[in-house]
Amino acid sequence: SSICPVPFFDTRFLTLYFCRQIKSSLMEVFSIIIPVYNRPEEIDDLLNSLTRQTYVHFEVIVVDDGSSIPCEPIVNAYNDRLRIRYFYIENSGPGLARNQGVRYAEGEIVIVLDSDCIVPASYLEQVHESLMRYKVDAFGGADRAHSSFSAIQKAVNYSTVSYTHLRAHET
């Protein structure tokens, strides 16, 4: 086996990544799953960052986990800028919301982002290049704490995601 370096991205909190195995270089579609609960302003920041991606072959699936503060109007405001779908489920926690999003995914590569993330413009391009270079079934890595975080928040952020490599899948 080998070690697969994972790109380091500037995000607010923990970002989770999962991917299905890429079957061919022709299938280059990402499905970005975003579970959200009562965070319309954060989902707006994340969606805005996704509009600037240099890699354009992706869809966005927002799964609202029973929010009492509506985020559907914010999601709908991106219909003309993103390939985006919105689903509402009864409050069941982020795990079920993520799983529901995966069920709706049409892309070959599934990425799960928390609603409080902000991704740089080259994020998907870098992920795609890394996935083409290394054969992996799943990947993850450290994220960068937002500059507005306190020292305690930065320490908690570091302690929860202090790894940066994942073993590559052997073929």
Question: Where on the chain are the PLM-derived regions?
Answer:
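The conserved acidic donor/metal-binding loop of glycosyltransferases
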Residues: D114-I118
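Acidic donor-binding segment of Leloir-type glycosyltransferases
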Residues: L47-Y88
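Conserved donor NDP-sugar-binding/catalytic core segment of glycosyltransferases
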Residues: S122-Q153
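Conserved small/polar residues in nucleotide/adenosyl-binding loops
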Residues: S1, T164-T171
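A structural helix-start
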Residues: V36-D44, D64, S68, P120-A121
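Short aromatic/hydrophobic "clamp" motif used to bind/position activated sugar donors
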Residues: V110
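Glycine-rich, basic loop-to-helix element that forms the pyrophosphate-binding segment
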Residues: I89-A105
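N-proximal low-complexity "stem/linker" segments adjacent to membrane-targeting elements
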Residues: K23-R52
